[in-house]
Amino acid sequence: MEKKAFFQQLDERTDIRYTDSGLKIFRLKFPRAHLRLCNVKIDFGSRDVCIRAESGDTLLPYGTAHFLEHLLFWHNGRNLYSDFFAHGALLNAFTTYTDTNFMFTSLPDRLRQTIPILLDALWNHSFDKKIVAQEKAVITSEIQTAHLNHQLSYHYQLISMLSPSSPAAVFPAGRIEDIEALDISDLQKAYKAAYQAHRMTLFLIGGSENTETLLPPHLQLEKRPDYHAERKIIPACPPVLSQKMMLGDEERMEDTWTGLQIGALPGQNDLLSIKLYWDIAARILFQLDSPFFQEIQQTYRLEIDRLSAETYIYEDGGFLILHSQGTHSSAYIDVASYYVTQKKEQVAAWLQYGKDSLTDAIIYDSDYVRKCFEWAAECDRCDCSFLDMYHIIQDMDAQVFLSLIDAMASSNKAIIHVSQKEAIRQ
């Protein structure tokens, strides 16, 4: 099947409805899937540390969204995991920077029993002081364990060096002092503001059944109401700092972590476009098996044994975290930027590799309902279709790629050099 036709087919299999309470239903059919994936996404994540109301703003401790996620596993004195397991379903939950998710997989004939249980728990929570105290201990332990994960620690340390006041610099579970400061009043205010039907999307992925047959009958569905979505944009990067931020021994730089601030490009501030452009660029620049890396390694005899990159791009800014190992690890960004400027005639070929890599990944991921959910959630978050994604990917041109290279070379950077001894211990 032609790639464009595949993305069109994804859209044809997508059915978006709303309940009368405002709950959004995102149905994506996949005939080959044996199980059905259900995910309720709440528009409340680790970045949400302020509740705005007519009576005034309420500041929340970091980690509030994640703490609520833990609490909502307890309903009427019972643990939801056990209730779902009794129905042959495995319930999980996770909090990201932008939202909170409750996810489970199930046989199709069990959804009419499990979905009402989950929605009842999310909409009708009763706060219990004993459970709050219990979860404070659990989450404190979780934070302490996360600090032992050096790679995770470097991620947040780099973002903190670049933007110390950003919520993105704080682990989603918060800090120990935040957990100690949380009280039931904070949690109740956050719950009341966030866990509203109009702030939720229920994803149903897999199978070929009509949406109505999978949902409990009391949920009356309507088509999407007429409205104009607000385009999500990303701001420009802050001014470049005069001083480079660095930790560790620059003389022993075989293991290097680099953080970069990224933002809007000249003439382009659309959030989804910037996300996809950086995804393509990362596949070109930071994958050991990419033609670009093979060329640059042979040309300059670079000794780099490991190379990986992750991007975090949101409406309030973006970061790229690069991890490289090898004798020339700390020089890679500068060398790569220079090589692109010297070989501009090859940009089209590199771009085609990056575009093919991303579109193939989406097509491959679609065979797995968990991965397919992530792309569906991106469509929902940016209010776009799968075909819109495809067109953004294909329309990326050489000038955009060169703008990314310029941004990468000139952006604020934070660097952590890890000693060889410490890297081996990890």
Swiss-Prot record:
Belongs to the peptidase M16 family. This is Putative zinc protease AlbF. It is an enzyme of class 3 (hydrolase). Gene3D superfamilies: Metalloenzyme, LuxS/M16 peptidase-like. The keyword Metal-binding applies. The active site is at E69 (proton acceptor). Zn(2+) binds at H66, H70, E142. PANTHER family: METALLOPROTEASE, MITOCHONDRIAL-PROCESSING PEPTIDASE SUBUNIT ALPHA. Its EC number is 3.4.24.-.
